[in-house]
């Protein structure tokens, strides 16, 4: 197996005390956020569950700032997601109850990749992002922890893989420091998410 399973993601979130408002892990049919007055988060796969999934992304709703965060470790644009995975954020937003609000919603999404396409760590990066969301309210992207990651233009074949590879070291160090579940399952989690799992460069 490569990547991170739904069960592993839930254990990691629990070990980091990030379960408040967490709706669960979903496949591409995620219905969106349905309670606009509550903090809500989710980790969503761009593929269907019955086919094993494809790629994890994280989503979060902050009712105080009226912000919806969308985090894709590979930084794909909407058009690229549609082309590569047949997945659309816009379709999910239309299903969400948030659009029924009279207030304007701010949608923030990363525009750079932080994960190399040779890596299977998209799920781990999603958990890392949700940690930033909870710890730095209103500044899920603009904080010292998230900004410690190198960003690169989204590409199937990164021009400078080494800078993204450094992010994986930062990621593992973070989990070793913060998550008892990761420490107890370190060998397996690293083996299933390591660099070079996918031949992209």
UniProtKB/Swiss-Prot annotation:
The keyword Chaperone does not apply. Transmembrane segments: none annotated. Its EC number is 3.4.22.39. The active site is at 55, 72, 122. GO terms for cellular component: host cell nucleus; virion component. Keywords: Autocatalytic cleavage, Disulfide bond, DNA-binding, Host nucleus, Hydrolase, Late protein, Protease, Thiol protease, Virion. It is found in: Virion; Host nucleus. The keyword Ribonucleoprotein does not apply. It catalyses: Cleaves proteins of the adenovirus and its host cell at two consensus sites: -Yaa-Xaa-Gly-Gly-|-Xaa- and -Yaa-Xaa-Gly-Xaa-|-Gly- (in which Yaa is Met, Ile or Leu, and Xaa is any amino acid). Requires DNA and protease cofactor for maximal activation. Inside nascent virions, becomes partially activated by binding to the viral DNA, allowing it to cleave the cofactor that binds to the protease and fully activates it. Actin, like the viral protease cofactor, seems to act as a cofactor in the cleavage of cytokeratin 18 and of actin itself. Induction: Expressed in the late phase of the viral replicative cycle. GO terms for biological process: proteolysis. One of its GO terms (molecular function) is cysteine-type endopeptidase activity. The record marks 52-53 as: Cleavage. Belongs to the peptidase C5 family. All late proteins expressed from the major late promoter are produced by alternative splicing and alternative polyadenylation of the same gene giving rise to non-overlapping ORFs. A leader sequence is present in the N-terminus of all these mRNAs and is recognized by the viral shutoff protein to provide expression although conventional translation via ribosome scanning from the cap has been shut off in the host cell. Interacts with protease cofactor pVI-C; this interaction is necessary for protease activation. Cleaves viral precursor proteins (pTP, pIIIa, pVI, pVII, pVIII, and pX) inside newly assembled particles giving rise to mature virions. Protease complexed to its cofactor slides along the viral DNA to specifically locate and cleave the viral precursors. Mature virions have a weakened organization compared to the unmature virions, thereby facilitating subsequent uncoating. Without maturation, the particle lacks infectivity and is unable to uncoat. Late in adenovirus infection, in the cytoplasm, may participate in the cytoskeleton destruction. Cleaves host cell cytoskeletal keratins K7 and K18. This is Protease. It comes from Bovine adenovirus 4. The lineage of its organism: Viruses, Varidnaviria, Bamfordvirae, Preplasmiviricota, Tectiliviricetes.
């Amino acid at each position: 197996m490569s990547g991170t399973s739904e069960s592993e993601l839930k254990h990691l979130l629990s070990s980091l005390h990030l379960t408040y408002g967490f709706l669960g892990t979903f496949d591409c049919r995620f219905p969106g956020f349905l309670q606009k007055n509550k903090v809500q988060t989710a980790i969503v796969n761009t593929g269907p569950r019955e086919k094993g999934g494809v790629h994890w992304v994280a989503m979060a709703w902050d009712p105080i700032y009226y912000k919806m965060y969308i985090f894709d470790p590979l930084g794909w644009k909407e058009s690229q997601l549609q082309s590569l995975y047949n997945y659309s954020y816009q379709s999910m937003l239309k299903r969400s109850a948030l659009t029924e609000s009279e207030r304007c919603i701010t949608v923030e999404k990363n525009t750079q990749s932080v994960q190399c396409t040779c890596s299977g760590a998209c799920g781990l990066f999603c958990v890392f992002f949700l940690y930033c969301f909870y710890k730095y309210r209103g500044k899920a992207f603009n904080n010292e922890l998230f900004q410690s990651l190198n960003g690169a233009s989204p590409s199937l074949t990164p021009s400078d893989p080494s800078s993204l590879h450094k992010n994986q070291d930062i990621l593992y160090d973070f989990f070793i420091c913060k998550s008892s579940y990761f420490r107890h399952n370190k060998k397996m989690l690293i083996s299933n998410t390591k660099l070079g799992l996918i031949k992209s460069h």
